[in-house]
Swiss-Prot record:
GO terms for biological process: cell wall organization. Belongs to the Casparian strip membrane proteins (CASP) family. Residues 1-42, 112-130, 199-202 are cytoplasmic. The chain crosses the membrane at residues 43-63, 91-111, 131-151, 178-198. Keywords: Cell membrane, Cell wall biogenesis/degradation, Membrane, Transmembrane, Transmembrane helix. It comes from Triphysaria pusilla (Dwarf owl's-clover). Residues 1-30 are annotated as: Disordered. Homodimer and heterodimers. Its main location: membrane. One of its GO terms (cellular component) is plasma membrane. This is Casparian strip membrane protein 1. InterPro entries: CASP/CASPL, CASP_dom, CASPL. It is found in: Cell membrane.
Amino acid sequence: MEKSESSTIQIAESSKDRKGKAPLLPPPVHHERAAGYKRGVAIFDLILRISAATAALAATIVMGTTEQTLPFFTQFFQFRASYDDLPTFTFFVIAMAIVTGYLILSVPFSIVCIARPVVAAPRILLILCDTLTVTLATSAAGASAAIVYLAHNGXSDANWLAICQQFNDFCQRVSGAVVAAFVSAVLLIFLVVLSAIVLKKH
């Protein structure tokens, strides 16, 4: 019996064919690295967000509970100072309460950005709302800072007397509330910058 031998001929691919073919599953190194970077930024965002909420809450509580009554009084007058005597401080309490509420409600969206760092929709929503909240916080803090300055120094041109020599505790508390509001506003600005950096990487 005759046995037929079969031989196989292997043809090497040319360099042009090799260049034209792309790998089916490219290594996802760059994608994983970008996701890890965005997740780290999102964690830092969450920390700043909680810190800003704490500062805004402290500013709201301190200003909203500020009241001082002097130990002496006359037959017709009792010398008392409260935050609601001034419309600017009332606006401050309302504005910072809104800022606090927003920051607390935005925490779940920040957690979503940690869990799914590649998704851009939560980050876009946060940067828009953060920008509006920065405007509200800075307007409340700036207006109240002007009143605090007048309370400490007065205005001789307008014949406004400084009241902090008499209402020392009142002035210390409102000053602390304004400082806390500015801290919250600065942290909100950092949050806007972080969101802008992450969106630029998309």
